[in-house]
């Protein structure tokens, strides 16, 4: 009996085994050849040693970089801070870099800054290549006055053949251009835009640069830049002034006459009627020193607000829509590079005297708004007002006990 029990106990015991295996070190087989990225060469693969004219090529989608091939003894003008790289230079081909101020007084008067006037002039005895990017930004003080700070910008290339003149607007618009004798850059008058005696009735902003002749000019726009063509003089376009980057025309006069200000029809709003002024509590008398402090603080705030508005209007011009007539080409930027007011001018005229609404004689009681609905057997509905529901609830309870 005991033997049978022992055999049964041994049969119910299960065996488990655990084996430990040492990991084998993995080996990585190195690549036999270097990996080639699927990208277009920035400077190209062609030989540029014999080129006669400067060649500009924008790169990327959207274009944020420009490759420039400069022939021997031809200068390249690049705005300060926008030069990214040089290629094809060395001991045998040293590039001479010098600073050049272009329209310093004009930029100080129009934009209140010297940054847009400082360019680098590059020239070498042999051909070389350069990379240019729109690395422009504004200062913190300028942004407080309404001039935009750093934002996303893209490049746009102008290839002038001498048949069209271009008016380029904006503080950060001109990034680079080739220095040949046939390309000319002029600037508008230093007078503000609200003085029209020097420009007739044109609504073209007074902060433009006129590019004429033959050659290449690299522009920069806020956001993305698009081209709009107005094929004939019957074509017109209404465009917000802050989004206009450049406009073409046969002559400067043709450009100025094609731009007029557009005003939307004003919506007539009835004037607010004046009501009698109700006399409330008599204000507590204040000391003369407290009254003087309050008045001085109010006048100071008004003076700062007026100065800021005047400076912003002088720098950016008034926010307005432009009616542009063809035939011509337009360069439009998707984002604006100027201060935008929070609200548009209202057509409502303020009253001549302060307005105050007389308080009602009595406040309506909430009991006057209580009502109950009775639905009859013939589907008729009747509404009745009641000061409270106590009486009606008692009637309903009495009907239930019947």
From Swiss-Prot:
GO biological process, one term: inner mitochondrial membrane organization
Ranges of Low complexity composition bias in the record: 343-364
Disordered: region residues: 343-365
GO cellular component: mitochondrial inner membrane
InterPro entries registered for this protein in UniProt: AIM24, AIM24_sf, Trp_RNA-bd_attenuator-like_dom
Subcellular location(s) of the protein: Mitochondrion
Transit peptide stretch: 1-25
Domain of life (superkingdom): Eukaryota
Keywords: Mitochondrion, Transit peptide
Family statement: Belongs to the AIM24 family.
Protein name: Altered inheritance of mitochondria protein 24, mitochondrial
Originating organism: Lachancea thermotolerans (strain ATCC 56472 / CBS 6340 / NRRL Y-8284)
């Amino acid at each position: 009996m005991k033997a049978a029990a022992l055999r049964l106990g041994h049969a119910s015991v299960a065996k488990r085994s655990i084996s430990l295996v040492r990991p084998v070190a993995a080996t990585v087989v190195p690549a036999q050849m270097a990996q080639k990225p699927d990208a277009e060469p920035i400077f190209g693969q062609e030989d540029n040693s014999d080129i006669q004219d400067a060649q500009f090529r924008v790169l990327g989608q959207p274009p944020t970089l420009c490759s420039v091939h400069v022939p021997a003894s031809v200068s390249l003008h690049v705005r300060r801070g926008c030069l990214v790289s040089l290629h094809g230079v060395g001991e045998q081909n040293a590039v001479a870099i010098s600073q050049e101020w272009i329209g310093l007084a004009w930029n100080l008067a129009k934009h209140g800054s010297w940054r847009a006037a400082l360019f680098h002039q590059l020239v070498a005895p042999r051909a070389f290549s350069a990379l240019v990017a729109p690395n422009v930004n504004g200062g913190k003080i300028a942004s407080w006055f309404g001039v935009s700070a750093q934002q996303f910008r893209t490049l746009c290339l102008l290839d002038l053949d001498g048949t069209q003149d271009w008016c380029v607007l904006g503080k950060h618009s001109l990034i680079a251009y080739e220095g040949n004798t046939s390309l000319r850059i002029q600037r508008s008058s230093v007078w503000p835009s609200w003085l029209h005696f020097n420009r007739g009735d044109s609504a073209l902003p007074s902060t433009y640069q006129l590019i004429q002749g033959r050659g290449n000019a690299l522009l920069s726009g806020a956001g993305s830049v698009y081209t709009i063509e107005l094929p004939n003089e019957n074509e017109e376009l209404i465009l917000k002034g802050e989004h206009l980057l450049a406009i073409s025309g046969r002559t400067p006069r043709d450009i100025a006459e094609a731009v007029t200000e557009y005003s939307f029809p004003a919506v007539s709003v009835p004037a607010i009627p004046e009501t009698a002024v109700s006399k409330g509590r008599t204000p507590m008398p204040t000391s003369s020193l407290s009254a003087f402090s309050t008045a001085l603080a109010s006048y100071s705030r008004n003076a700062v607000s007026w100065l800021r508005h005047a400076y912003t209007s002088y720098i950016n011009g008034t926010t307005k829509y432009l009616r542009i007539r063809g035939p011509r080409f337009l360069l439009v930027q998707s984002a604006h590079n100027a201060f935008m007011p929070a609200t548009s001018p209202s057509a409502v005229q303020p009253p001549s005297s302060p307005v105050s609404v007389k308080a009602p004689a009595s406040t309506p009681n909430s009991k006057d708004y209580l009502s109950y609905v009775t639905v009859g057997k013939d589907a008729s509905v009747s509404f009745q007002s009641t000061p409270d529901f106590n009486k009606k609830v008692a009637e309903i309870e009495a009907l239930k006990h019947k």
